Amino acid sequence: AYGESANVFGAP
């Protein structure tokens, strides 16, 4: 979900 830990894209 949005606002969880950093993902593969590097977004928050």
Swiss-Prot record:
Alphabetical keyword list: Chloroplast, Membrane, Photosynthesis, Photosystem II, Plastid, Thylakoid
Chief localization: plastid
GO cellular component: chloroplast thylakoid membrane; photosystem II
Example GO BP: photosynthesis
Induction pattern: By light.
Domain of life: Eukaryota
Localisation: Plastid, Chloroplast thylakoid membrane
Entry similarity comment: Belongs to the PsbP family.
Known role: May be involved in the regulation of photosystem II.
Protein name: Oxygen-evolving enhancer protein 2
Native species: Physcomitrium patens (Spreading-leaved earth moss)
